[in-house]
Amino acid sequence: MINLFTKDWEINNIETILFDKDGTFIDLHYFWGQMTELRVKEIIKRFNKNNEIFEQLCLCLGYNPKTGKMLSDGITALYSRSKIIDIFKYDLKKYDIYTTDIELEEIFDYVSDIFYKNMQTYTKPIPEAIEFIKKVRALGIKIGIVTSDAKKSTDLTIKHFRWENLFDVVIGRESSTETKESGIPTKMALRELNANPKTTVMIGDAPMDFISAKNAGIEKTILVATGQIDENKLKETSQYTVKSLSSIVIN
């Protein structure tokens, strides 16, 4: 077991840590910014629309192409993929684009295939997060990933960066028909790790991660402000909040 603490809080007797991916140990702004641009370009192409709506469609998906940042109140920050598609489908009607959830799923999957063939171009780790993961791993902690991104995509990321020895289990979007917020995917990770929720901590960058952990019986979630939401806002959800995982002391 290990203990984690900062000048503001302490969590003791940890055996297992579950991590969110994007915004937690992968640079979310760059990753999802590039993904959003590819999705929007494909939609403009398929529906034969003018490129003048490119910026507006990016903003609908919660990304500002002018700043290169994801919006803290954008749908990508707040919801899982199925909800994002449902909202985006209705936003597209404003631009005379009429589609279905199934068609948008197909477009998103098509773009993901292209995206992950060029992973080295689009994916950047958060160095201090990877260092933290390596430290707790060296102390014998069981580590899992629970993400609303695809398991296939996450596995490719792990393979690309040669992180196979860092993670014991990956639960992704296709691992369950239930959303991440339901807590079911998190329960799956706990079960596969044979982990006790009482000695498990979730680490993520958004309220979604807190909700997911709570619904799985995990009492403590550390929220890190390396994603779309600043630390003060995250403190409204969890008392265990940091600007960076590098500020956490491990013993």
Task: Tell me the role of every PLM-derived stretch.
Residues 24, 147, 205:
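Conserved G/P- and acidic residue-centered "switch" motifs that form tight phosphate/ATP-binding loops
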Residues 1-17, 30, 134, 151-251:
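Asp-based, Mg2+/Mn2+-dependent phosphohydrolase catalytic module
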Residues 17-19, 106-111, 120, 129-158, ...:
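Substrate-recognition element of Asp-dependent hydrolases with the DxDx(T/V) motif
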Residues 54-63, 131, 139, 145, ...:
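Surface-exposed, interaction-prone regions with an acidic/low-complexity signature
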Residues 11-127, 139:
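N-terminal helical cap/lid subdomain that shapes the substrate entry/recognition surface
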Residues 101-105, 126, 130, 164, ...:
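Short, structured helix-loop boundary elements
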